[in-house]
């Protein structure tokens, strides 16, 4: 499959002691092949529960191409949690802590009772998903499914234990000896 092939050959950048994989789905560089995006979204649709879903939710930035494509395939509208405040009525701020940053995320466009699916590009520490789940609970949304494309580290387990929600992923990876390994 193209996702796994491109992960195995993607560049690795070391920052401090952490090895980052640089991939079109997680970083938008070097170039996003539409075949790869189509494959990923088709796989998300196959494993996801999109029945009676009102909205698809992601956090900026790399979830945006995923939910845009997914919305076109499913005709379900999407909502993007932004890193900046818009001060719209009902806006919900939540704190986000990831492996590389801390800050606020802001949720708009969710009504009480909305049935939602959460989509994210990568789960590693779980910080982004925990923030999204917290905001959606505050808004009164019903979370029907949570799908991340790439799983790395213990984030999936952390989110499942902390929130009680099951996380689906397309591929689990690690970086070993400067290369991505599919687990």
UniProtKB/Swiss-Prot annotation:
It catalyses: IMP + diphosphate = hypoxanthine + 5-phospho-alpha-D-ribose 1-diphosphate; GMP + diphosphate = guanine + 5-phospho-alpha-D-ribose 1-diphosphate. CDD domains: PRTases_typeI. Signal peptide: none annotated. GO terms for cellular component: cytoplasm. Keywords: Cytoplasm, Glycosyltransferase, Purine salvage, Transferase. Pfam families: Pribosyltran. It comes from the Archaea. The keyword rRNA-binding does not apply. Gene3D superfamilies: 3.40.50.2020. GO terms for molecular function: guanine phosphoribosyltransferase activity; hypoxanthine phosphoribosyltransferase activity. GO terms for biological process: IMP salvage; purine ribonucleoside salvage. It is found in: Cytoplasm. InterPro entries: HGPRTase-like, PRibTrfase_dom, PRTase-like, Pur/Pyrimidine_PRTase. Its EC number is 2.4.2.8. Pathway: Purine metabolism; IMP biosynthesis via salvage pathway; IMP from hypoxanthine: step 1/1. Homodimer. Belongs to the purine/pyrimidine phosphoribosyltransferase family. Archaeal HPRT subfamily. PANTHER family: HYPOXANTHINE/GUANINE PHOSPHORIBOSYLTRANSFERASE, XANTHINE PHOSPHORIBOSYLTRANSFERASE. Catalyzes a salvage reaction resulting in the formation of IMP that is energically less costly than de novo synthesis. This is Hypoxanthine/guanine phosphoribosyltransferase. It comes from Methanocaldococcus fervens (strain DSM 4213 / JCM 15782 / AG86). The gene is hpt.
């Amino acid at each position: 499959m193209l996702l796994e092939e491109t992960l195995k050959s993607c560049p690795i950048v070391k920052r401090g002691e952490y090895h980052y994989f640089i991939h079109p789905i997680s970083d938008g560089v070097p170039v996003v092949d539409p075949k790869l995006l189509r494959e990923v979204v088709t796989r998300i649709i196959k494993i996801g529960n999109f029945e009676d879903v009102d909205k698809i939710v992601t956090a900026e930035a790399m979830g945006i191409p995923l939910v845009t494509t997914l919305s076109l395939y499913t005709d379900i509208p999407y909502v993007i949690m932004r890193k900046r405040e818009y001060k719209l009525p009902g806006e919900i701020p939540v704190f986000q802590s990831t492996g590389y940053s801390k800050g606020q995320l802001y949720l708009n466009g969710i009504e009480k009772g909305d049935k939602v699916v959460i989509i994210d590009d990568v789960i590693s520490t779980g910080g982004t998903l925990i923030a999204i789940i917290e905001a959606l609970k505050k808004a009164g949304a019903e979370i029907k499914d949570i799908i991340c494309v790439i799983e790395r580290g213990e984030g999936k387990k952390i989110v499942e234990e902390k929130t009680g929600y099951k996380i689906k992923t397309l591929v689990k990876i690690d970086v070993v000896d400067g290369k991505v390994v599919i687990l």
